[in-house]
UniProtKB/Swiss-Prot annotation:
Record has Transmembrane as a keyword: no
Pfam families for the chain: CSD
InterPro entries the record matches: Cold_shock_CspA, Cold_shock_domain, CSD, CSD_CS, CSP_DNA-bd, NA-bd_OB-fold
Coiled-coil region: none
Name listed for the protein in its UniProt record: Cold shock-like protein CspA
Keywords: Activator, Cytoplasm, DNA-binding, Transcription, Transcription regulation
Boundaries of every CSD domain copy: 7-67
Single GO MF annotation: DNA binding
One Gene Ontology CC term in the entry: cytosol
Gene name linked to the record: cspA
Domain of life: Bacteria
Protein location: Cytoplasm
C-alpha cells in the first residue's frame, strides 16, 4: 500500500496495546498495534506525537507498519 505517510498519534493505550494515528493528508485514522511500536524500538506512543509510517492491509483493514518518529 502507501509508504511514508505523515501523521500524528491520536491516542495510544499501552495497557490495551493499540491506538490510532491521524493522517496529515486527511485520510481515515489508522490502527497501530504494539507490534509496530516494538518493531520501531519504542516503548509506547504519546498523544500528539508526529510519526511517519507505511500502510499495510490485512483482512481488509489498514494498519500502520514501519513506524518512525518524525
Amino acid at each position: 500500500m502507501a509508504t511514508n505517510i505523515v501523521g500524528k498519534v491520536k491516542w495510544y493505550n499501552s495497557t490495551k496495546n493499540f491506538g490510532f494515528i491521524e493522517q496529515d493528508n486527511g485520510g481515515k485514522d489508522v490502527f497501530v498495534h504494539k507490534s509496530a511500536v516494538d518493531a520501531a524500538g519504542l516503548h509506547s506512543l504519546e498523544e500528539g506525537q508526529d510519526v511517519i509510517f507505511d500502510l499495510e492491509e490485512k483482512q481488509g483493514k489498514a494498519y500502520a507498519v514501519n513506524l518512525r518518529i518524525k
